[in-house]
């Protein structure tokens, strides 16, 4: 039976119209697990989903805004602790899959006193999250890391830094994770005819992908000509290989 994992940066879902349009588009995507970034804890993908993990409240935004929320319609989800409760969240889904949601630093942002320049902030944040990935990867459950990586893995540099990309690719390899949304399967690249590339990714345990095939898709962040976000959404559907 197909199983779909999706992630979408909702650009803070700042008004009721955008929230309603986002929910309509998410209903169309029909994912089993959602990792939402720059979202709100009360913005559900649908009535049959439960919020199973969330990052800490943002200190720079409305009380209900979160960098990461994880939703599922699968029974048995529960939150897991992470080393960075501001920009990550983690949940055990059905006891078989750990889902780790992330927002990594964007161009111009800082992290723990590290500047954006020379990808210092990116590398600092990634180093902390990498330890979580490594520990989760040692567990019997499979691992999914998804969210806004703020870094393309495409055939041509799009955003943000070749140095950040090199560190990200190394961290994924060390944790035996595969970015299903990387080149040559980048669905945003395909959606836009090469005008843009994925910076939001769904990464899965290599062992899982040896048993199942993962087909990525992307959708435009709009409904009926109205803009919803500045990020396309992406999803990966897992089926028997």
Where on the chain are the PLM-derived regions?
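Active-site regions of metal-assisted phosphoester/phosphodiester hydrolases
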Residues: 1-7, 11-23, 72-241
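Catalytic-core segment of enzymes that process non-peptidic bonds
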Residues: 57-59, 65-75
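Short, ordered beta-strand-loop transition motifs
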Residues: 55-63, 82-85
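N-terminal, active-site-proximal structural segment of metallo-dependent hydrolase catalytic domains
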Residues: 1-49, 60, 65, 241
